[in-house]
């Protein structure tokens, strides 16, 4: 604040400190009148005459007059001490900048203009916080404004030798004065920044405030789009949180949100191309990437292994890329791909390249130790196709652990609990009183 205060001091020094004669207009000062009673000595004709007595009227006896009502006493309130209201014209462009404490300050000078320029009285005013941002954006030279706030004293800069200290106003409320007969348009900062004597000040319409630092950042983004990452699409698709920055600088991590963008920057954004970084480890990210993988599976089936028919573990992937090892599961497949998947291929001990046919076919990878499972699939297929060659024990099992089906010639046993899903709907109807050996 001192920096801006000193600058304003230099700006108004011609009228406050060093005018042409290094004097302030006499009408600006109230000098108490001194009444002196003296005796005059008149010397004439070589002789002395007695001192002339000057008649002095006695002061009025105030007590003899009717006593007036004394001023009322009010409660002392620190927030209204040194409070002042001023209306004047802006004489200098608003100066703006940050201070060492992290806050933003702005300042200018106002004057109550009169017919004679020599009698203009300039008063420095200071804005703090959000009100400073509003002032630098909206207040222009020659504007007529109303300000209210507290008076404070700032010592003159070192290069000024005048002994008078500089009186300034720390503005708390700012209004534009449109006309003498019209109402004023009020601009107020957020409530947390305003110290007001009103308990509940009226809220004004929010003004989009853009400080110099933010404006410079948007300028850098427009001029160097390849140095920034665009997260607008990620936010729209829910890949990042709603409060995530819309743009983030690759080096340094500087963040920008569209809500702080100047109008001129918004108009140029659509013309630029940015790099897009899709977050890692996100479910929706995997879905987006999976769309491309499923498309590759349908278009290049010979590059994928089909494990659907011989999975020993439900967590094992249904498809696996031969070169990259990328895995796909049917539970995550898009709806459009279901109708384009190939029929199951089985009984392939080693992966081999399928012949090009009109129907989509995939190679099948048979994991080690899974040949027995493939063989059991064939046995269930034999049961479905040749039910007369099997004993059906489902209705008359004497031992719950006994097989549900048993081959009449080979003695091969099958249990419903181990049957493939596809076989359940194709099993033969229940049979009774079959002539067969007694089952254990």
UniProtKB/Swiss-Prot annotation:
It comes from the Eukaryota. InterPro entries: NA-bd_OB-fold, Primosome_PriB/ssb, ssDNA-bd. Expressed primarily in the female gametophyte and in the floral abscission zone. GO terms for molecular function: single-stranded DNA binding. Its main location: mitochondrion. PANTHER family: PROTEIN OSB3, CHLOROPLASTIC_MITOCHONDRIAL (PTHR10302:SF12), SINGLE-STRANDED DNA-BINDING PROTEIN (PTHR10302). This is Protein OSB3, chloroplastic/mitochondrial. It comes from Arabidopsis thaliana. The gene is OSB3.
């Amino acid at each position: 604040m001192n920096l801006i205060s000193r600058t304003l001091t230099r700006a108004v020094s011609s009228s406050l400190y060093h005018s042409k004669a290094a004097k302030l207009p006499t009408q600006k000062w109230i000098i108490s009148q001194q009444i002196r009673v003296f005796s005059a000595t008149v010397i004439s004709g070589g002789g002395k005459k007695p001192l002339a007595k000057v008649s002095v009227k006695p002061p009025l006896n105030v007590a003899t007059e009717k006593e007036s009502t004394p001023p009322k006493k009010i409660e002392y309130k620190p927030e209204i001490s040194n409070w002042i209201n001023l209306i004047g014209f802006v004489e200098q462009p608003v100066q703006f900048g940050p201070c060492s404490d992290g806050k933003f300050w702005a300042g200018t000078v106002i004057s109550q203009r009169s017919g004679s320029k020599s009698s203009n009285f300039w008063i420095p005013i200071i804005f703090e916080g959000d009100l400073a941002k509003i002032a630098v954006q909206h207040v222009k030279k020659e504007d007529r404004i109303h300000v209210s706030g507290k008076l404070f004293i700032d010592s003159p800069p070192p290069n000024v030798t005048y002994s008078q200290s500089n009186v300034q106003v720390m503005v708390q409320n700012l209004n534009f004065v449109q006309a003498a007969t019209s109402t004023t348009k009020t601009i107020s900062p957020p409530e947390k920044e305003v110290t007001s004597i009103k308990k509940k000040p009226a809220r004004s319409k929010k003004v989009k405030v853009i400080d110099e630092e933010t404006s410079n950042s948007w300028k850098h983004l427009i001029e160097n789009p390849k140095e920034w990452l665009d997260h607008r699409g990620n936010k729209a698709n829910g890949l990042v949180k709603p409060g995530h920055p819309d743009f983030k600088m690759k080096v340094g991590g500087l963040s920008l949100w569209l809500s702080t963008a100047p109008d001129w920057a918004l108009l140029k954004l659509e013309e630029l191309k940015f790099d897009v970084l899709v977050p890692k480890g996100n479910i929706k990210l995997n879905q987006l990437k999976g769309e491309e993988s499923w498309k590759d599976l349908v278009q290049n089936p010979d590059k994928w292994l089909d494990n659907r028919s011989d999975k020993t573990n439900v967590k094992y992937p249904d498809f696996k890329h031969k070169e990259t090892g990328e895995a796909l599961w049917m539970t995550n497949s898009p709806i459009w791909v279901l109708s384009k998947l190939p029929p199951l291929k089985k009984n392939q001990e080693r992966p081999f390249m399928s012949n090009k046919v009109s129907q989509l076919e995939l190679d099948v990878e048979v994991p080690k130790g899974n040949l027995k499972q493939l063989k059991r699939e064939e046995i269930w297929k034999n049961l479905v196709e040749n039910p007369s060659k099997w004993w059906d024990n489902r209705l008359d099992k004497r031992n719950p652990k006994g097989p549900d089906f048993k081959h009449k010639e080979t003695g091969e046993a099958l249990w419903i609990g181990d049957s493939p899903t596809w076989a359940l709907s194709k099993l033969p109807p229940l049979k009774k009183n079959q002539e067969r050996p007694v089952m254990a």
